[in-house]
């Protein structure tokens, strides 16, 4: 088992990475929580594979377990689903001394975590991420949110979990497209902070070799995120580097109404697009875009998307959470493994955000 300690003072917690940890989850929770009620929030896809098993495992340790199952997919991460969750929590008579457990991918973790952060002004919660993207990114660091019609993650909070339990065996039932979806974020970590990870990703022969080394990959990504979050928990400076590729990526997701491409696919395109622009401007080392293109192709992610309209992308990007007044903070690469934040005036963003 690999364990990382997120050091955030009173908000510190452990990140556990171990194959088979889901089989021991009730015992693990009992070491962290001595109350009676646990609300398990999951989605209909994950529930089919793991809901009943984990519910029984937790009940075996004497807890009263209540389950909330939401529809899978980004379209569920909205205010209506959130209010439905609030209503169920009220029906269950949940108090601030009870516990929420989120079991699922990024959508479940985000909306379940936001419900925990806001219901009764805060209930403790534990993350059990089941997708690669959630295991290496969204379950760690305390960002919780829901989407609005105008854009992604526009209503949110910073609310740290009591613990994160990561079981790579969940990935065995993950559709190959969603494994590659997670690789969009994995590539991001290598590109911004870890050239050695990027090199290993280039060297893996196929998905089988990737899965043989998945604990290394997960740990490498979580280690980077832990370090960045510890330095900047509230996303005022360094933590913005974790949004490399996301300004364009989120805009593309919104452009297609979250229907055509996954989050990781859009991030991959966003990384390639902004780097092609910054290399053209002489900011990024020559050849970096080609390296990104090759690794994006290797993991079946898009570097070219048809039918995008620049004006709409600029319009959506203006709502990006990295915007500050008339400026937007963009994450750019100097080279693989070396990034920086560039403060760009809104009227100049087209140079960087132009779709390619």
From Swiss-Prot:
Where does it reside? Cytoplasm
Gene3D superfamilies on file: 3.40.50.1970, Dehydroquinate synthase-like - alpha domain
Q: Binding residues for Zn(2+), per the UniProt record?
A: 185, 246, 263
Q: Which residues bind NAD(+)?
A: 106-110, 130-131, 143, 152, 170-173
Cofactor note text: Binds 1 divalent metal cation per subunit. Can use either Co(2+) or Zn(2+).
- According to the lineage, what is the superkingdom? Bacteria
Catalytic reaction equation(s): 7-phospho-2-dehydro-3-deoxy-D-arabino-heptonate = 3-dehydroquinate + phosphate
Q: Name one GO cellular component term.
A: cytoplasm
Pathway entry: Metabolic intermediate biosynthesis; chorismate biosynthesis; chorismate from D-erythrose 4-phosphate and phosphoenolpyruvate: step 2/7
Q: Any idea of its EC number?
A: 4.2.3.4
Q: List the disulfide bonds.
A: none
Q: Which cofactor does it need?
A: NAD(+); Co(2+); Zn(2+)
Could you tell me one molecular function GO term of this UniProt entry?
metal ion binding
Going by the UniProt record, its keywords in alphabetical order are: Amino-acid biosynthesis, Aromatic amino acid biosynthesis, Cobalt, Cytoplasm, Lyase, Metal-binding, NAD, Nucleotide-binding, Zinc
| TM ranges | none
Give, as one word, the top-level EC class. lyase
What function is annotated for this protein? Catalyzes the conversion of 3-deoxy-D-arabino-heptulosonate 7-phosphate (DAHP) to dehydroquinate (DHQ).
Query: What's the name of the protein?
Result: 3-dehydroquinate synthase
């Amino acid at each position: 088992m690999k364990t990382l300690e997120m050091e955030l003072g009173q908000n510190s917690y452990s990140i556990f990475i171990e194959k088979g940890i889901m089989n021991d989850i009730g015992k693990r929770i009992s070491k962290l929580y001595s109350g009676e009620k646990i609300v398990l929030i999951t989605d209909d896809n994950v529930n089919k594979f793991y809901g009943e098993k984990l519910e029984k495992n937790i009940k075996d340790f004497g807890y009263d377990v209540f389950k909330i199952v939401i529809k899978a997919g980004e379209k569920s991460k909205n205010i209506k689903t959130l209010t439905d969750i609030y209503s169920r929590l009220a029906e269950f008579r949940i108090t601030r001394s009870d516990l929420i457990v989120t079991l699922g991918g990024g959508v479940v973790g985000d909306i379940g975590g936001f419900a925990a952060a806001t219901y009764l002004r805060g209930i403790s919660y534990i993350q059990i991420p089941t997708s690669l993207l959630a295991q290496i990114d969204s379950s760690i660091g305390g960002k919780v949110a829901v989407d609005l019609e105008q854009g992604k993650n526009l209503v949110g909070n910073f609310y740290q979990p009591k613990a994160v339990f990561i079981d790579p065996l969940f990935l065995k039932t993950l559709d190959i497209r969603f494994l590659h979806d997670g690789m969009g974020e994995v590539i991001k970590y290598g590109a911004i902070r870890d050239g050695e990870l990027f090199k290993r990703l280039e060297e893996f022969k196929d998905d089988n070799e990737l899965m043989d080394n998945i604990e290394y990959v997960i740990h490498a990504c979580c280690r980077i995120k832990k370090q960045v979050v510890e330095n900047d928990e509230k996303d005022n400076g360094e933590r913005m580097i974790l949004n490399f590729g996301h300004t364009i990526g989120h805009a593309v997701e919104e452009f297609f109404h979250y229907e055509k491409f996954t989050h990781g696919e859009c991030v991959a395109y966003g990384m390639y697009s902004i780097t092609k622009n910054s290399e053209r401007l002489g900011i990024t080392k020559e050849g970096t875009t080609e390296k990104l293109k090759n690794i994006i192709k290797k993991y079946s992610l898009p570097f070219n998307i048809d039918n995008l309209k620049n004006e709409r992308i600029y319009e959506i990007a203006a709502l990006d959470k990295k915007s500050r007044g008339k400026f937007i903070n963009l994450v750019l690469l100097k080279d693989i493994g070396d990034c920086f934040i560039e403060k760009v005036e809104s009227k100049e963003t087209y140079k960087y955000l132009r779709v390619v």
